[in-house]
C-alpha cells in the first residue's frame, strides 16, 4: 500500500515485480493506503466500461507516466476511485508505460476481462502515431 511514493520506493516495486513473476503474475497492482487501486509496479492502470476509458486519479498516488499523458491528451478519460471489488464492473483493463506502450489485460486475480478490443485499438493507434514520427 503506497500513496505518492513510487519514486522513493523503486526498489520495493522491483522486488514486488520479481515476487509476482515467481507466482506467474506479469505485473503486480498496488493499492494505496485507502485500499484504492493506484498503479502497477511499473505501469499506469486503465479500465473500459461501455466504451469509456476510466483511470484512477493522480490523487490515488501514482506517477503520471508518459503514455498516460498521451492518452489524456488524445482521448476523453473519466477519472474515478476504483476499489478491488469494482473489478467486475469493467469490460476491459489495460496497462501503460513507455516501454510496453499499451498492454491489454485478460485477467486480474479472479476477474477476467472478456474483451480486449479497445486496448488493442489504442495500442495500434499509438504504434501508428509513433511510426508517423519516424
Per-region residue spans from a language model:
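Conserved catalytic-core subdomain
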Residues: 37, 42-134
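Single conserved hydrophobic/aromatic residue that forms the stacking wall/gate
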Residues: 1-8
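Short, basic/aromatic recognition patches
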Residues: 11-30
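Acidic Asp/Glu-based divalent-cation binding sites
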Residues: 8, 27, 44-45
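Short, well-structured alpha-helical patches and their helix-loop capping segments
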Residues: 9-12, 63
Amino acid at each position: 500500500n503506497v500513496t505518492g511514493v513510487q519514486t522513493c520506493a523503486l526498489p520495493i516495486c522491483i522486488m514486488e515485480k520479481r515476487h509476482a513473476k515467481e507466482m506467474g503474475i506479469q505485473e503486480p497492482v498496488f493499492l494505496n493506503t485507502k485500499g484504492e487501486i493506484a498503479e502497477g509496479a511499473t505501469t499506469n492502470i486503465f479500465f473500459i466500461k461501455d466504451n469509456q476509458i476510466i483511470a484512477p486519479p493522480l490523487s490515488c498516488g501514482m506517477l503520471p507516466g508518459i503514455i498516460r499523458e498521451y492518452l489524456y491528451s488524445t482521448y476523453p478519460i473519466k477519472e474515478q476511485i476504483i476499489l478491488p471489488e469494482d473489478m467486475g464492473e469493467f469490460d476491459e483493463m489495460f496497462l501503460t508505460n513507455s516501454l510496453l506502450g499499451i498492454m491489454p489485460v485478460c485477467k486480474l486475480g479472479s476477474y477476467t476481462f472478456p474483451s480486449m478490443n479497445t486496448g488493442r485499438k489504442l495500442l495500434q493507434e499509438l504504434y501508428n502515431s509513433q511510426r508517423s514520427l519516424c
